[in-house]
Amino acid sequence: MKTAFYKNSLINLEQTNREDFQKLYEDGKKGLLSCSVCREQVRLYLGIHNHPTFYHHLKRNSTCEDPFIQPSSNSDHDKDEYLERDGFRLPKSRTIIAAETTPSYKTAQALKILQPFNEQKATSIEETNGYMKQLQSAGVHFDENQARAVISTEGPLLILAGAGSGKTRVLTARTAYMLVEQRIAPNRLMLVTFTAKAAAEMKKRLTSYPGIDLRQINSIVSGTFHSIFYKILLYHDRERWSGENLLKKDWQREQIVKEAGRKLGLDDKEFAYDLALQQIGLWKNTLQFPGQVRAESAWEEKVALLYRDYEKVKETNGLFDFDDMLIGCHQLFKEKPHLLEKYQNRFDYFLIDEFQDINKVQYELIKMLSLRTKNVCAVGDDDQSIYAFRGSDPTYLLDFAKDFSGTKMVILNQNYRSPHEIVETANAIISANQQRHKKEMRAQYTLSVQPKIFYPYDEEEEATMIVTDIQEKIEAGAKPEDFAILFRTNTASRAVFERLTASSLPFKMDQDIESFYDRFIVRGILSFFRLSLNEDDSDAIKHILPALFLKQSVFRDLQAESILQDCSMLEALSHVKTGFAFQEQKLKKLVKIVRSLTTTPPLLAIERVEKELGFQDFIKKRGNEGNKLEKGSDDIRDLKVAARPFSSIVELIEHANHMSAMNREIKALGKKMNNAIILSTIHRSKGLEYQNVYLLGAVDGSIPHDFALDSYRNGDMQPLEEERRLLYVAVTRAMEKLYLSVPQNRRGRKANPSRFLSKLKKEPLVES
C-alpha cells in the first residue's frame, strides 16, 4: 500500500518528501500510522529489495488496497516550511507532504558481471610418493600453484596469495614439508606472522599434519616480529629490556607526551595526543629519529618536539615501548656485527606472512638476518596493503626481487572463498590500480547471485534498510554470525549501531569503537546543551573551556567565582578575568545564549553553538590536529544528521547518554558473544570472512576518503590506490552475498557514488 493515515491526514508515499521516509518508519513503530482502508495500525517497510510500502504488521494476509483518492496537499498541515542552511533543511514546523518533493525512491541494482564464469576448476595435483602424498592422504590437497609454493624451499620465493587462495594452508604445509620431507631442523626456521592469533592458528594447523609432533612445532622460532626480536633483546640484556620497563598501556605513553605537551603550552583536552603517538610510531617504524624528522605541517612540528622529549624521558628512566623492540634489535645488529653474524648462522630459512604490511625496520631486519642464505619466503598480496598509517609500504613486496636476486614468484590466483560474481567484482575494482603485480583471481564456483548496490536516502535510512534486510534473512533461517557490516571509519557506524540497539538482534563490534557522542567535537557541542539544562554541570564546563579558548586551569577560578558571587558555574563565566576585553565581553554574552538553547530545536541549537558561541572558529583554529581522516567540521555535520529526529535538546541529550551507555554495554557483552552480527572497520575485517557483507557509504568522500581525494588533486596517487585496496578487501570478505550502500545524501549534502564503482555497469535487480 502506498497510502496511510498519519496524524488524521491521508498521505501518499509518492507525494511525500523522500527525506521523511525514515520519520514515517519511526512513527509507524510508535503506532502513529493507520491503514487507509481498515484503520488498523500499519508500518512503513524500508528494505533493500522491495519498494517502500505500508504494511499490516499485526495481521498477515491483509486484503486492504489503496483507495482511489488523492490526499490533499494544500492544507496548512500538509505544507512544508523550511530554512535552507549549509545543505540542511531546518524545519520551521515538521510536516510530511509537500507540493514539490525531493527525489523519489531509487531501486536497488545488481552489478553487471564483466566477465562470464568460466568453469575451469583448479586441478588438484595427484602425488604418487613422498610427503606430499602423505598430505594428500590426510585430506590436504593443493592446486598446481599451491604445490609449487610448498615444494620451492631454496632461495628467495615470493608467493602472491590473493584473497581466499588458501594462503594459510600453503604456508603451514610448506613448513611441514621442510621438516618432514627435507628433514630441516625446526630451530633453523623462523616463521613470522603479523598477529599472535595467526601464529597460534598456524601451530594448530601444523599439529593436524602427518609426521609432525608438538616438539617440532615448539622448536620453530615463530611469532610476531615484536615477540621474536624482543626475545633476542632479552637474551642479550635482560635488565635493560625487562618487562617491568615496558610501556604496555596507551595511557602510560600518553602520560609522557602530555607532560611534554604542557611544557609547550598544549592543552590536554584540545591536543590530539593519541594521534601524536601514532605519528611518532610511524616515524620510528620508518627509522626516522628525533632530529631527522622533516615535519610537513605545523601540527607535525609540535609532534616532533613531543617525540624528542618522549624519547629523552624513556632514555632517562630506562623505559621502552613496543616500537623500541624492533628498533633496539636493529641497533643491536648494527652496533655488534658479531652478534648479527651469530644470528645469520643460527637461521637458514625465513617465512614471513602478510608481507604486504611490512614496514621499513621489519624489512631491514629480515634483509640483515637472511644475508647469508637468502632463503626468504615472503607471502602476501599487494592488493591488500592497507596500513600506510603504520608505516607499511607495498613497495617492499613489489620490489622484493630487486633486493633478493634470483627470486622465484608463485601466484595463488584461485579464490576458494567467494563465488564468481564477487571475485569478478573485486577484480574489476582493483584492476584500475597502477602500483601492483598484474594478476586476476578466479573463482571455483558461481551462485548466479550478483552483488547489489542500493540507494538509501541518507545514513539513517541506510541503517534501517540494512537492519531490515538482516532481520528478513534471520527469519528465513540465517544466523546472526553470518552477517558483517563494514565501514571506512568508526564515525560511519553511528546510525547502524543505533538501529541495531533498537532491534532484538545480537551484535558485537571492535573494542576501540567509541560512542559517536563521546567524540571530542561532538561532546564539546553537547556540553553547551548540557550546561543549558544544568548550569552547574562541572563536566560540561570542562569540555567547553577549549572552545572558549580558556585553559583548564580556569576551571578552579570558576569554582571560586561561583562561591564568591553566589551564582551558577555558567554565570561565573561572565566574571572571569582573562586580560582580554574582547574575550571577557564575549563570555558575558555567552550566558544568555546558552540559557536560550533549552527552548531551541536541536538543529538550530547546533548552529547557534557553531556561529554565535564561536565553535566554528575554534574548529578552524584547531585544524584537524594531524588527523587526516576525521575533521571536526565533519563531526558537526554528522551530529546534525543524528539530531534531525529530535524536537528538543532534552531528547537529544537523553538519546546521547543512552547510546554512550549502550556502547559500553555492547562492548562488554561482545567479549563473550559468538553468534552475533559483526560491526567492523574494513581494516579490522582483513583476513576474516562472512556469508553476507554490507558496506556502508560507498560514495566519494567515504571510500575513497576525502583525504585521498585531496592528495590525488595535489598529485599524490598513493592514498587513492590504498583506498581502492580497502574497497577490494571489503568486497573479498563476502562468501555469498555482497551489498554496497550508496546513500544519495551524506552529512546533509548530495553524495556521488564511489568512483571505484564506475567501471561496474548496472542492470535491473534480480530478487535474491
Regions found by a protein language model. Name each.
Residues 85, 89-124, 134-136, 702-768:
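Accessory/regulatory regions of helicases
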Residues 101-239, 341, 424-427, 732:
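P-loop NTPase Walker
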Residues 128-129, 178-329, 374:
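A basic/glycine-biased coupling hinge at the interface between accessory DNA-binding modules
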